[in-house]
């Protein structure tokens, strides 16, 4: 199933439908997306060239979509930064209070670590047991200093958008 960000949700909906209509007792479903694979995880062969001729914006990146929506509905950069800051604060408070403890199953994995000084790479054992992409130290001043990804006059920055990650 290739539904980009909604792939996991799509497979869960398909599983639920199968349980309801086909009488399956139990189905395991889920998904992951990849931002590190060129093309955002979409193999070139999965993009229909004929469809692109008819609807060239069909595979538009979310950054472009977000900038268009912000422009259309007059959602200012400052408002987006304020919302982002509040979201960071809420996430930090929820993590501090262990609100997600029962929602995340710890997973053992391997992680590549790159030494910033020497650029030496190593692989280490790692346990993922929490969302790690939030930044509780975020400030309005810090957010305001970030340049928009698509250049001056645009809205989306590394501080007011979701992180780029595989998962």
Predicted regions and their residues:
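Conserved catalytic cysteine-centered active-site region
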Residues: 1-25, 45, 56-64, 136-163
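Active-site-proximal alpha-helical scaffold in enzymes
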Residues: 3-32, 70-99, 167
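Residue-level recognition of conserved structural "scaffold" positions that shape functional pockets
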Residues: 15, 37-38, 105
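Generic structural motif
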Residues: 35, 66, 110-114
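Short acidic, glycine/serine/threonine-rich loops at helix termini
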Residues: 37-43, 118-119
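A glycine/threonine-rich phosphate-anchoring loop and its flanking beta-alpha core
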Residues: 41-78
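N-terminal extracellular/periplasmic Venus flytrap/periplasmic-binding protein-like
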Residues: 82-167
């Amino acid at each position: 199933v290739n539904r980009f960000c909604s792939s996991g949700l799509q497979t869960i909906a398909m599983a639920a439908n199968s349980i309801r209509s086909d009488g399956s007792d139990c189905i395991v479903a889920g998904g992951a997306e990849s931002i590190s694979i060129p093309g955002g995880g979409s193999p070139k062969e999965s993009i229909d060239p004929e469809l692109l001729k008819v609807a060239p914006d069909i595979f538009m990146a979310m950054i472009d979509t977000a900038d268009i929506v912000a422009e259309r509905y007059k959602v200012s950069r400052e408002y987006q930064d304020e919302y982002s800051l509040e979201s960071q604060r809420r996430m930090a408070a929820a993590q501090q209070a262990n609100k997600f403890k029962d929602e995340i199953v710890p997973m053992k994995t391997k992680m590549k670590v790159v030494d910033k000084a020497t650029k030496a790479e190593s692989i280490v054992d790692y346990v993922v047991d929490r969302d790690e992409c939030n930044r509780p130290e975020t400030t309005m001043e810090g957010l305001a200093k970030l340049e928009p990804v698509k250049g001056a006059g645009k809205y989306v920055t590394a501080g007011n958008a979701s992180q780029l990650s595989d998962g």
